[in-house]
A protein has these predicted regions:
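Residues that form generic nucleotide/phosphate-binding pockets
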Residues: 48, 117, 138, 142, ...
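Active-site-adjacent structural segments surrounding the nucleophilic cysteine of cysteine proteases
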Residues: 2-132, 181-187, 202
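Stable alpha-helical elements in mature extracytoplasmic
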Residues: 84, 89-96, 110, 131-139, ...
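Active-site-adjacent substructure of cysteine-protease-like catalytic cores
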Residues: 153-207
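Noncatalytic regulatory segments and standalone regulatory/sensor domains
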Residues: 187, 199-254
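Repeat-unit-sized solenoid/scaffold elements
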Residues: 128-129, 165-183, 230-250
């Protein structure tokens, strides 16, 4: 009963703030955006207070699942000069490594870990932008995992790995992701990497650690947008050709 009272109070406060904090001159678009944001917040609070039970679907997969692990930022000190500007691949690999090894981290430890990985990559003559195959090599030879590269991954394939507590590393067109993640600067990077840690069929969303912004922990992307964004680094070697890159994801296994 007490939980229900809290829920009702949160809903009423959210609706009240909709009108209290709006300026006098507003557009229908702003009203709609504010309403959508309020509804999302209410859903989040409802899920926290009264979580919906997990349901096993006919496919054998649960309708939702989430892997919990530490968030690794590609720019732990908010310095966006090189190598941090292009350290999303390293941060994604470390996200999986820290999950499997149950590590916690600090900005200093993250910085040191990224720089050590880059030093290894330099022995292989890798550039700032690694493709999936190169990331797999780093995962194997530097971090000590087995790797699998999945071509043309489907939503169900990704969900199957996640449901088994296996994170999925993606490389993607950040400008496509920008449609749902306005925390990116300059419309998002051409080439980006992130780690899928969860999914929610009710919301039709993947849950990722998007290492590219400080707000990227457990960030939600729609199934359709994230699948659309997935591309390996293009064979041309030019980031601008990202949409010509093959659709691949990387799995690291203990």
């Amino acid at each position: 009963m007490f939980k229900k009272v809290i829920l009702v109070a949160v809903i009423l406060l959210s609706v009240f703030s909709l009108f209290l904090f709006f300026p006098k001159k507003i557009t229908p678009e702003k009203i709609e955006n504010k309403i959508n944001q309020t509804v999302e917040k209410i859903d989040e609070v409802k899920e926290t207070i009264i979580p919906k039970p997990t349901v096993i679907l006919e496919s054998g997969l649960p309708n939702k699942h989430l892997i919990s692990t530490v968030f690794v930022e590609q720019s732990p000190e908010k310095n966006w000069d090189q190598p941090w500007q292009d350290a999303c691949e390293e941060a994604s690999l470390l996200t999986v490594d820290f999950y499997y090894t149950n590590k916690t981290t600090t900005s200093e430890f993250t910085k040191e870990s990224i720089l050590n990985m880059i030093s290894f990559e330099e022995t292989r003559n890798y550039t700032h932008d690694m493709n999936i195959s190169q990331m797999a090599t780093v995962g194997e030879d530097y971090l000590g995992y087995k790797s699998e590269i999945i071509d043309n991954p489907t939503i169900d394939q990704i969900k199957k790995y996640i449901s088994q507590n296996i994170p999925v590393i993606v490389t993607a067109n950040g400008k496509t992701l920008y449609a749902e993640n306005k925390h990116f600067k300059s419309g998002g990077p051409y080439y980006h990497s992130a780690v899928i840690l969860g999914y929610d069929d009710d919301k039709q969303q993947f849950i990722v650690h998007d290492v590219g912004t400080q707000f990227g922990a457990y960030f939600h992307y729609s199934y359709s947008l994230l699948i659309e964004s997935i591309h390996d680094f293009p064979d041309s070697g030019k980031k601008e050709d990202i949409n010509s890159g093959q659709k691949r994801v990387l799995i690291l296994l203990k």
